[in-house]
C-alpha cells in the first residue's frame, strides 16, 4: 500500500500563497508565457477538451492567438478533416483520442495519410490503465514526433508509469470538475484535494503536468503553477462565452449557455451509467476578455511572487488556512 496518502489533503480554497518582495514596476512587465511541447503559449491555460467548451472555430482562434487548445474526441469522423484544415491554415493541430480498438485504426490512418498532429491527448477518465499504457506505446511508435499527453490520473505511481510508457505529459485530476460527478457516483477521485494531488504528483514527475479540474477563480491558476502544473485545463470558467458551443437560453431576463460534462447524458446521447451532468452557466461575453483577464491576474501573481516570469510562482511559500479563504467574507 502506498504511503503517499499520509500527507495533509487540501484544495484551492484552503491555500494562500505568501508574497515576496516585488522587483517589477508594473504587472505589465511580468511574462506569463509557457513552453509546452515545441511551442510557446501566452498563458498556461487550456480550455477543457469538452464538447461544450471547444469546437473547430474556437480552436482556430486560439491557435491563431498563441493559446494552447485540445480538440475534443466526440466527433471522431471529423478529426482527420480538422487536422487537414488546421495545417492548411498554417496552424498546429491538437486532437484527442480514446482507447477503443477503432482508435488504433485511426492512428494507422494518420500514418497512411502522412498526417502528423503536433499534439495528441489520450482522454480517458481513469488514465492509470493498462489500455492507456498500450495506447501510449502505440502512438509513440507510429507518431514519435507528436507531443503526447495522457490522463487523467491521480497518483505518483500513475505519473511514473505513463511517463515510462512514453507520455510527454500527464493530466492530473479525477472528478474535481464542476460538471463531473465521478466522486459522487463512484466514491473515487480528487474532488476536495485536487491541489494536494497535483503537489504529490509533481514530486515524481520528470515531464510536464496538466492540472485538470477544480478551477473556480483566476487565482487558482497561480496556485496550480505553484504546485507543479505547466498547464491548467479549465472547463466551466471558459464555457458560456460568445464563442463557446452550446445553446443560448434566457431565463427571467438573464442569459445562460449550456455546459455539460464529457460523461453526461447529453454527451453520450442516451442514458447510460453517466459520471457527468448538464448545467447552465452565465453568458460571459467574449472569451477574449476572459483570457485577457486571466493573463492580467497571472501577471499580478508574478509580481506578488517577486519575479518577472511564471516560474517565480513556483518558489513562493504558502499557508494552509484553518478554514477556507472565503470564510472571512461571511
From Swiss-Prot:
* Binding-site residues, NADP(+): 209-232
**Catalytic residues (positions):** 180 (thioimidate intermediate)
Q: Recorded E.C. number(s)? A: 1.7.1.7
Query: Which is an annotated GO molecular function term of this record?
Result: GMP reductase activity
Q: Which SUPFAM superfamilies match?
A: Inosine monophosphate dehydrogenase (IMPDH)
A GO BP entry is: purine nucleotide metabolic process
What this chain does, per the entry, is described as: Catalyzes the irreversible NADPH-dependent deamination of GMP to IMP. It functions in the conversion of nucleobase, nucleoside and nucleotide derivatives of G to A nucleotides, and in maintaining the intracellular balance of A and G nucleotides.
Give the protein name, as stated in the record: GMP reductase
Q: Which organism is it from?
A: Lactobacillus acidophilus (strain ATCC 700396 / NCK56 / N2 / NCFM)
Amino acid at each position: 500500500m502506498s504511503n503517499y496518502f499520509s500527507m495533509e489533503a487540501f484544495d484551492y480554497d484552503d491555500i494562500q500563497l505568501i508574497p515576496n518582495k516585488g522587483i517589477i514596476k508594473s504587472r505589465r512587465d511580468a511574462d506569463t508565457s509557457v513552453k509546452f511541447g515545441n511551442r510557446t503559449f501566452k498563458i498556461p491555460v487550456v480550455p477543457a477538451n469538452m464538447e461544450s467548451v471547444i469546437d473547430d472555430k474556437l480552436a482556430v482562434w486560439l491557435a491563431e492567438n498563441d493559446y494552447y487548445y485540445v480538440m475534443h474526441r466526440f466527433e471522431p469522423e471529423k478529426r482527420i478533416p480538422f487536422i487537414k484544415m488546421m495545417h492548411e491554415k498554417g496552424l498546429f493541430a491538437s486532437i484527442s483520442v480514446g482507447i477503443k480498438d477503432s482508435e488504433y485504426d485511426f492512428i494507422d490512418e494518420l500514418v497512411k495519410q502522412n498526417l502528423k498532429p503536433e499534439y495528441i491527448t489520450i482522454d480517458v477518465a481513469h488514465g492509470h490503465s493498462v489500455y492507456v499504457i498500450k495506447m501510449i506505446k502505440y502512438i509513440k511508435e507510429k507518431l514519435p514526433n507528436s507531443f503526447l499527453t495522457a490522463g487523467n490520473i491521480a497518483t505518483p505511481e500513475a505519473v511514473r508509469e505513463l511517463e515510462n510508457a512514453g507520455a510527454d505529459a500527464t493530466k492530473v485530476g479525477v472528478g474535481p470538475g464542476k460538471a463531473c460527478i465521478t466522486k459522487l457516483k463512484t466514491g473515487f477521485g480528487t474532488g476536495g484535494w485536487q491541489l494536494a494531488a497535483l503537489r504529490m504528483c509533481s514530486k515524481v514527475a520528470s515531464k510536464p503536468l496538466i492540472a485538470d479540474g477544480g478551477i473556480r477563480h483566476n487565482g487558482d491558476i497561480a496556485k496550480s503553477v505553484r504546485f507543479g502544473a505547466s498547464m491548467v485545463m479549465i472547463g466551466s470558467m471558459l464555457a458560456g462565452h460568445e464563442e463557446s458551443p452550446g445553446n443560448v437560453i434566457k431565463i427571467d431576463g438573464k442569459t445562460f449557455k449550456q455546459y455539460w460534462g464529457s460523461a453526461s447524458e447529453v454527451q453520450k446521447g442516451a442514458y447510460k451509467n453517466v459520471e457527468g451532468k448538464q448545467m447552465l452557466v452565465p453568458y460571459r461575453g467574449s472569451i477574449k476578455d476572459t483570457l485577457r483577464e486571466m493573463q492580467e491576474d497571472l501577471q499580478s501573481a508574478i509580481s506578488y511572487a517577486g519575479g518577472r516570469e511564471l516560474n517565480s510562482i513556483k518558489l513562493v511559500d504558502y499557508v494552509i488556512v484553518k478554514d477556507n479563504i472565503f470564510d472571512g467574507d461571511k
